[in-house]
Amino acid sequence: MSQSKKTVALIIMDGWGHREDTTNNAIAHAKTPVLDRLTKETTNTLISASGMDVGLPGGQMGNSEVGHVNLGAGRVVYQDFTRVTKAIEDGDFFENEVLVSNVDKAIKQDKAVHIMGLLSPGGVHSHQDHIFAMIKLAAKRGAKKIFLHAFLDGRDTPPRSAKAPLEAADKVFEELGVGKTATLVGRYYAMDRDSRWDRVEKAYKVIAKGEGAFNVACAIEGLENSYSRDENDEFMQPTVIGDAAPIEDGDALVFMNFRADRAREISRPFVEKDFSDFEKGEHIDLSAFVMLTQYAESIDAPAAYPPVALVNVMGEWLANHGKTQLRISETEKFAHVTFFYSGGKEDLYEGEERILIPSPKVATYDLQPEMNSTELTDKLVEAIESGKFDAIICNYPNGDMVGHTGNFDAAVKACEAVDTCIGRVVEAIKKVGGDCLITADHGNAEKMADETTGQAHTAHTSELVPFWHVGQKTTARSGGTLSDVAPTMLHLMGMEQPAEMTGKPIVTLVK
């Protein structure tokens, strides 16, 4: 029988930032006896998870994709957001071969260029400036028909904040003298990632067919009507603006979201002829479907900014040294502990196993703030006790998923549920003589309302995140970032870190 392994577990509490001010702070208000005890008894510090420390523009809040890429890479990774923004500033964006050649194909046939994406200054899944640059590129290439299909945010931005981006889009069209916003739909429908195809179908039908729940004269009227129905930006029902502009054979469609996880589902019915998750009707024979970045290897479409290969990320380094690893989370964050943590690689490494716990099927997670954390912990504890794994990467989605709802009381419950689970995990790790690192990918639940506007604060924050180490005797340094976490794990495992990992261990073993 093989010897049991002394597991090193990385527990990522999604959306769990540190904020001294307890006002509207669900984490501070939650009863968290386990983490309170760990703060008193174990090595702990605060680390950075936002801005330039994770490869984002200075001051930009962190997010789950960026967080997990940095956690797994062991180096600061230049993010797609920054990459595209820089290309626009340099002018390279307007010469991008994939964008230019595919837009030109439609223009030569006197066909329309459709642009879809999250029209938001949020910077998590997209940025409105990227969308405006794409509209300008299409106009510059000579497109006479440019249609914007705007997804509304209200999740990474205040719940009712779409007016300014919509007005800015109208201004761009006015200045160019061509194009218009054709449809509006909340991201709840257009950006699902949990196979809720009934939602995606509604978004697809309004974008592709011009079939919405409502028809209005202009975007602002549509938005005001949505608010009068008590629908915040995120939940706005599919709305057609003016004369419908359905997508036709020969048209080009450019998807301007740069983050992959919530872009995959809505892409598929446009790309796959034999798509069958809902009845989409006649397949549209597009001249091109272009992804801003690669959403998945399985989506057969060109990417304007394909992934930059990351060599010797944590998963690869472990596999190359004959180590075993487990990735485990609920559906909502499964892509993060697998695809993103592996630096954009879908496939399993040698010695890697994965456990997916389905997230609860509820409309919004404030209805079940504990989500399926108990089942997740059952499987996680079982894996630790099995002695099979050298390394375990686990994500608890609660702080982020419930934080995004803006429901303070539910967020408190979510944090309490996670604390209880952490208690079980720590006990299991202690039993097997392993090490446990507990941290977060970004903040969220520590700020649930905006003091200035009085609105719910549903977005991430730029706060530092906590970092605890349970296990061998260590001391911690200050000034760490997410990219220092993989080197910390390797240090605790007694392994060298690859040259590509430029991060430094946050804790040092005390001899």
Swiss-Prot record:
Residues annotated for Mn(2+) 1 binding in this entry: D400, H404, H460
Organism: Pseudoalteromonas atlantica (strain T6c / ATCC BAA-1087)
Name the UniProt record assigns to this protein: 2,3-bisphosphoglycerate-independent phosphoglycerate mutase
Any GO molecular function: manganese ion binding
Keyword Isomerase recorded: yes
Signal peptide: none
Family note: Belongs to the BPG-independent phosphoglycerate mutase family.
Subunit (UniProt): Monomer.
GO BP field: glucose catabolic process; glycolytic process
Residue sites binding substrate per the record: H125, R155, D156, R187, R193, R259, A260, D261, R262, K333
Reaction(s) this enzyme catalyzes, per UniProt: (2R)-2-phosphoglycerate = (2R)-3-phosphoglycerate
